[in-house]
Amino acid sequence: DMTGPDGKRARTAYTRYQTLELEKEFHFNRYLTRRRRIEIAHALCLSERQIKIWFQNRRMKWKKDNKLKSMSLASAGSAFQP
């Protein structure tokens, strides 16, 4: 847990493999049980906290993407109204 000059924790750089595995897990389940979080942390050599925060961030991205998708569908639908 390296900290920068401002006392903040250094940003975690996930490997391609870790990201792929986390995305795969997220695809099946947007929320993790503590047991599953521990399993993933051990399998990917990450801390439980890193897994928890990755999932929090990913859920926010998912929410934002879905909001944008529904907005673009709504505006596309209204464009075709006679």
Swiss-Prot record:
Chaperone among keywords: no
Molecular function as annotated in GO: DNA binding; DNA-binding transcription factor activity, RNA polymerase II-specific
Keywords tagged on the record: Developmental protein, DNA-binding, Homeobox, Nucleus, Transcription, Transcription regulation
Transmembrane segments: none
A Pfam family of this chain: Homeodomain
Gene3D superfamilies given in the database record: Homeodomain-like (1.10.10.60)
Gene Ontology CC annotations of this record: nucleus
InterPro entries noted in UniProt: Antp_homeobox (IPR050296), HD (IPR001356), HD_metazoa (IPR020479), Homeobox_CS (IPR017970), Homeodomain-like_sf (IPR009057)
Bridged cysteine pairs (disulfide): none
PROSITE patterns on file: HOMEOBOX_1 (PS00027), HOMEOBOX_2 (PS50071)
Source species, domain of life: Eukaryota
Entry's localization field: Nucleus
Residue ranges: DNA binding: 7-66
Cited function: Sequence-specific transcription factor which is part of a developmental regulatory system that provides cells with specific positional identities on the anterior-posterior axis.
UniProt record similarity statement: Belongs to the Antp homeobox family.
Protein name from the UniProt record: Homeobox protein Hox-B5
